[in-house]
Design a protein with these regions (language model features):
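C-terminal lobe/tail of nucleotide-utilizing enzymes
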Residues: 6-113
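Flexible active-site lid/hinge loop adjacent to a nucleotide/diphosphate
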Residues: 2
Length: 113
């Protein structure tokens, strides 16, 4: 569970950059309303509860699975490849969050007596 993971990382002083909600929604081929098979907005609620950003909502897309199974990930096929848009949006959000964290973080303190 993501809540337990966030709590564990905080206990050991590892910064949590944010939440990524996998299998967030399904867009049927040919249009039609977006379907939230596992419920809507849980990733956002968790992110808000822990005070971290929601970095992405990854869609359910058969092309993501096919790409992984064949060793040809959709993300490697470019942003406009079927199934890749949500992955690229999430990657941009993670990169921006890493830059923000890098600008505000202090490195570890090592003391030798």
């Amino acid at each position: 569970d993501v809540r337990k993971a966030i709590e564990m990382f905080r206990q050991v002083n590892v910064e949590v950059l944010g939440v990524v909600e996998n299998m967030s929604y399904y867009d049927p081929p040919g249009g039609g309303p977006r379907q939230y098979i596992f419920g809507e907005g849980e990733g956002r609620r968790v992110a808000e509860a822990f005070g971290v950003p929601l970095l992405g909502e990854i869609e359910i897309d058969p092309q993501i699975r096919v790409g992984g199974d064949t060793g040809k990930p959709v993300a490697a096929q470019g942003e406009n490849a079927l199934g890749a848009k949500s992955l690229y949006a999430m990657a941009r959000a993670v990169a921006a969050r890493l830059e923000q964290a890098k600008a505000t973080s202090v490195g570890p303190s090592i003391q030798i007596d």
